Amino acid sequence: MTNIXXSHPLVKIMNNAFIDLPAPSNISSWWNFGSLLGICLILQILTGLFLAMHYTSDTMTAFSSITHICRDVNYGWMIRYIHANGASMFFICLYMHVGRGLYYGSYTFMETWNIGVILLFTVMATAFMGYVLPWGQMSFWGATVITNLLSAIPYIGTNLVEWIWGGFSVDKATLTRFFAFHFILPFIIMALAMIHLLFLHETGSNNPTGISSDADKIPFHPYYTIKDILGALLLTLALMLLVLFTPDLLGDPDNYTPANPLNTPPHIKPEWYFLFAYAILRSIPNKLGGVLALVLSILILTLMPLLHMSKQRSMMFRPFSQCLFWILTADLLTLTWIGGQPVEHPYIIIGQLASITYFLLILVLMPMTSMIENNLLKW
């Protein structure tokens, strides 16, 4: 009798992806985030499903339905907070995963990388629409501000915004369609993640050295299954600490006030994981320019393979590039801080400098440093 692992069509796919997959022997904990993202996605889909059972996507009852979930549904408060804070964990893992890809030159797997960028955009869109659903003040005004940005598109902008709204302002139609999109997108993300994995398994994983590891492979199971389980436990620990002790730490108090179109909150700001992009958007005084900078701040990732000038793939043996990478990290943290601050002196100029630094580092300084390092290799 042939082994089911090698004969059954479905089991064979699972086996080749998670059990007998040849993996480099030296991949570090930075390679854990892929599996953690998968866990986050499954967790978000499950908690989201149970929330959708009790949620109503109507402007009159949306806010009350969230209150009902938290007060009356068995463990509803827990499901709601796991979903809200699960989104934060999702983005922490996402940014770590992308940062790992940048540091170790994983972007040279072009298909995998580009699908990853599409995934990033899709997850961001999903999170934005999810934030609108509780229909609090920040939900309503966040939706108004961000959808309004599309009106900066020449000629079709205004029509496009009204088409997305389903009216002349963010209202009942907007909330209903956002709920529909928020429900469907995670399944699209799941399909994209499978394609992401498919392309990755065509080439095999990268490793910290950036050198081919074909000569030194080990089976994924048990070595990396146990490692992923450890990562999952740590993720669960971090998430449950947030959920059970400080569930509202990362949220906005304004969202506990029902949406009121007649009363604008003093500081409109998105969730923390969008603040860096929001800071870049605000740092340009022109509406269209700001929108372009906002989109380019993420889209610039697709240029990474073209901007790679080094003879080495990874930054492991490139100390100058490492310095710039960590400056970029600090710059993104600075932008995140600025995005949460009011638009006044000195925050405006700090935000503008941080935004310029962001694009300068990626487009000019890092490629130039790579070329200098190439010349140093000749010594």
From Swiss-Prot:
Co-factor binding comment: Binds 2 heme b groups non-covalently.
GO molecular function list: metal ion binding; ubiquinol-cytochrome-c reductase activity
One annotated GO biological process: mitochondrial electron transport, ubiquinol to cytochrome c
UniProt cross-references to SUPFAM superfamilies, sorted A to Z: a domain/subunit of cytochrome bc1 complex (Ubiquinol-cytochrome c reductase), Transmembrane di-heme cytochromes
Assigned GO CC terms: mitochondrial inner membrane; respiratory chain complex III
Keywords of this entry: Electron transport, Heme, Iron, Membrane, Metal-binding, Mitochondrion, Mitochondrion inner membrane, Respiratory chain, Transmembrane, Transmembrane helix, Transport, Ubiquinone
Residues the record lists as binding heme b b562: H83, H182
Lipid bilayer topology: Multi-pass membrane protein
A Pfam family that the UniProt record links to this protein: Cytochrome_B
Keyword Transmembrane helix set for record: yes
Main localization (coarse): mitochondrion
Transmembrane parts of this sequence: 33-53, 77-98, 113-133, 178-198, 226-246, 288-308, 320-340, 347-367
Binding annotation for heme b b566: H97, H196
Function recorded in the entry: Component of the ubiquinol-cytochrome c reductase complex (complex III or cytochrome b-c1 complex) that is part of the mitochondrial respiratory chain. The b-c1 complex mediates electron transfer from ubiquinol to cytochrome c. Contributes to the generation of a proton gradient across the mitochondrial membrane that is then used for ATP synthesis.
Originating species: Pseudoryx nghetinhensis
Localization annotation: Mitochondrion inner membrane
Subunit annotation: The cytochrome bc1 complex contains 11 subunits: 3 respiratory subunits (MT-CYB, CYC1 and UQCRFS1), 2 core proteins (UQCRC1 and UQCRC2) and 6 low-molecular weight proteins (UQCRH/QCR6, UQCRB/QCR7, UQCRQ/QCR8, UQCR10/QCR9, UQCR11/QCR10 and a cleavage product of UQCRFS1). This cytochrome bc1 complex then forms a dimer.
Protein family (similarity comment): Belongs to the cytochrome b family.
Essential cofactor(s): heme b
Alphabetical list of CDD domains matching this protein: cytochrome_b_C, Cytochrome_b_N
Something else known: Heme 1 (or BL or b562) is low-potential and absorbs at about 562 nm, and heme 2 (or BH or b566) is high-potential and absorbs at about 566 nm.
Binding site for a ubiquinone: H201
Name used for this protein in its record: Cytochrome b
